[in-house]
Amino acid sequence: MRVRYKPWAEDYLKNHPDLVDMDGAHAGKMSEWFEKEQPIYIEIGSGMGQFITTLAAQYPEINFVSMEREKSVMYKVLDKTKEMGLKNLKMICNDAIELNEYFKDKEISRIYLNFSDPWPKKRHAKRRLTYHTYLALYKQILKDDGEIHFKTDNRGLFAFSIESMSQFGMYFTKMNLNLHDEDDEDNIVTEYEKKFSEKGSRIYRMEAKFHKCFE
């Protein structure tokens, strides 16, 4: 998704009450940003925020974190959060490679990866959010029974992710090769998903966990 630069976005984000600061004072203490201590789910690459705000509204018993690196997009999520009166959703404006600056080990119950940039060129594989470098970060912050929910319209990225996760010691608990041809009442459609499914694009989805290590 190409984002149009908005020069005023950075000033808008500064000191916003729903945006987690980056001074490190709260690193590993994400629960302190919320009114209640509840399980934490995060979405990496939230875009315009339709998915994460819908989830937060449906599940008040869960705390949600939206992680988006584009300041020119993040303000939309902040606006939706305020309009909907969501007390269980906070935002981080940073790259996923910095995850362990915000979350301590085994703090997160679920990670959502929705329509991540496929980085189709082979030399850019390490930038994909299912590359082993990122999987190592996810394993570090996820609880032992934590999950990764992944959704894409890119067949190449889906195949790469299956291979990458398998090689990293993960297993799949659910897999959809054509999501919109199946009756999945729990599916929340993102802006991107709606646009491309209406054009006939196939949507791929899977849920995965890390194997537990036994001594």
Curated annotation (Swiss-Prot):
Q: Which GO terms describe its molecular function?
A: tRNA (guanine(46)-N7)-methyltransferase activity
* Gene Ontology CC terms: tRNA methyltransferase complex
- Is the Methyltransferase keyword given for this protein? yes
Q: Which UniProt keywords apply?
A: Methyltransferase, S-adenosyl-L-methionine, Transferase, tRNA processing
Q: What class of enzyme is it?
A: transferase
Q: What EC number(s) are associated with this protein in UniProt? A: 2.1.1.33
The record's active-site residues are: 117
Q: Establish whether keyword Mitochondrion is in the entry.
A: no
> Do you know which InterPro entries this protein is assigned to?
SAM-dependent_MTases_sf (IPR029063), tRNA_(Gua-N-7)_MeTrfase_Trmb (IPR003358), tRNA_methyltr_TrmB_bact (IPR055361)
Which HAMAP family does the entry mention? tRNA_methyltr_TrmB
Q: What is this protein called?
A: tRNA (guanine-N(7)-)-methyltransferase
Organism annotation = Staphylococcus epidermidis (strain ATCC 35984 / DSM 28319 / BCRC 17069 / CCUG 31568 / BM 3577 / RP62A)
Gene this protein is translated from: trmB
